[in-house]
């Protein structure tokens, strides 16, 4: 195993990247076999989760211990991904408490607290709602729906040092691996999910809030790409908010929101080539009825206006598994790839590799080109610390099943 690289080499890489603007290798395609990836968040150790939950609840925690545990967890999940057959992997989001809430530590303007509305499908089924509430009450976790901060002042990115350190830690870990990823990726949230989940109590209107968020997130997006990583923007808002914020409003109102967010994302990506970005969209990472979800065919036409090189969409869960057919009618742009969810992160069922292969092949038939399809997971395994449902050893078994399924599909497709 190679020694971990020193800070000088990291700084040299960063300087090289900056000097070359935002160029770099084109996003990987499945040139001679189906590649594998996932959506970002991976199971966190119990003690790390406890510290994140305590801090999120307003309790004082040992920040040095938290940082150490986060780095240790990241150093563990990277080789686990490699051993499980992941080609395009990341840091597991171990150094963040949740996929979007971490921005409150990197941006000004957030404070106070509020609670989000309840999902329409959760309200619809009282028995399920009671069961879910009991399960959450018994879990040590960071909530991404309750006691959330609000925008109470001007939102600005405070200091890129935090995201640079997170990128550097990931790079150090990658350099220590005998065999690394074919391509590393790094996640950051959509301005839309922050605008929806972290209530605007400062700006005159939603667009002004989105503009401020887009400008702040541009710092993070550009730093990630400058550091040599593929950027994944996590945007559940572009589907999920239909049955959350917009559950009592016309579909047209929701689609206008999607258009506003996509426009904001595009402006935030103005300096980044589209082939260095993929956009992850889903209907909410919870095991619920999901019978209030907006159909993919309604939102995909707007998503195709995003200036990104790939879309990451869920096709493994039983509510949306059929929607790969939408790709037959609403085709991707010629330069775009699709990361197709073929693994469900909300169940302990380990998908049979043949099932995975069949799911991959269905999407390939819809798209018409195996080189533009990558196998993935519907969503993260622990999008908010402690909320993950699948035990970590089963997570790695599911990843391995995906890799084997990709090999089976590749033998039939190439």
Predicted regions, residues:
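Domain-level signal for soluble alpha/beta catalytic cores
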Residues: 15-414
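Basic polycationic patches enriched in arginine
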Residues: 2, 13-14
């Amino acid at each position: 195993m190679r020694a971990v690289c020193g800070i000088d080499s990291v700084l040299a890489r960063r300087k090289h990247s900056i000097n070359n603007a935002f160029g770099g290798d084109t996003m990987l395609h499945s040139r001679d076999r189906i590649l594998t990836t996932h959506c970002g968040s991976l199971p966190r150790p119990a003690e790390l989760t406890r510290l994140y939950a305590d801090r999120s609840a307003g309790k004082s925690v040992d920040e040095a211990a938290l940082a150490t545990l986060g780095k240790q967890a990241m150093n563990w999940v990277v080789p686990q991904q490699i051993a499980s057959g992941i080609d395009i992997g990341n840091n597991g989001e171990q150094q963040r408490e949740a996929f979007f809430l971490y921005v409150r530590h990197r941006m000004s303007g957030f404070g106070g607290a509020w609670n989000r509305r309840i999902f329409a499908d959760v309200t619809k089924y009282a028995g399920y709602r009671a069961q879910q509430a009991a399960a959450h009450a018994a879990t040590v976790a960071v909530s991404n729906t309750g006691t959330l901060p609000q925008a109470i002042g001007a939102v600005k990115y405070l200091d890129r040092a935090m995201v640079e350190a997170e990128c550097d830690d990931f790079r150090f870990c990658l350099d220590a691996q005998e065999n690394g990823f074919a391509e590393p990726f790094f996640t950051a949230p959509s301005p839309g999910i922050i605008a929806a989940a972290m209530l605007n109590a400062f700006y005159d209107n939603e667009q002004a809030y989105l503009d401020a968020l887009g400008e702040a997130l541009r710092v993070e997006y550009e730093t990630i790409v400058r550091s040599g990583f593929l950027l994944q923007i996590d945007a559940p808002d572009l589907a999920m908010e239909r049955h959350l914020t917009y559950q009592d409003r016309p579909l047209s109102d929701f689609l206008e929101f999607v258009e506003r967010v996509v426009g904001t994302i595009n402006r935030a990506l103005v300096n980044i080539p589209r082939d260095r970005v993929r956009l992850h969209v889903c209907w909410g990472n919870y095991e619920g009825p999901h019978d209030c979800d907006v159909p993919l065919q309604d939102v995909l036409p707007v998503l195709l206006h995003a200036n990104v090189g790939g879309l990451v969409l869920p096709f493994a869960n039983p509510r949306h598994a059929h929607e790969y057919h939408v790709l037959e009618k609403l085709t991707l742009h010629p330069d775009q790839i699709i990361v197709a969810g073929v693994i469900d992160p909300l169940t302990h069922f380990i998908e049979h590799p043949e099932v995975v292969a069949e799911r991959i092949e269905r999407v390939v038939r819809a798209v018409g080109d195996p080189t533009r399809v990558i196998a993935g997971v519907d969503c993260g395994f622990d999008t908010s610390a402690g909320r993950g449902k699948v035990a970590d050893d089963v997570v790695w078994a599911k990843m391995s099943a995906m890799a084997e399924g990709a090999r089976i599909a590749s033998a039939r497709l190439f």
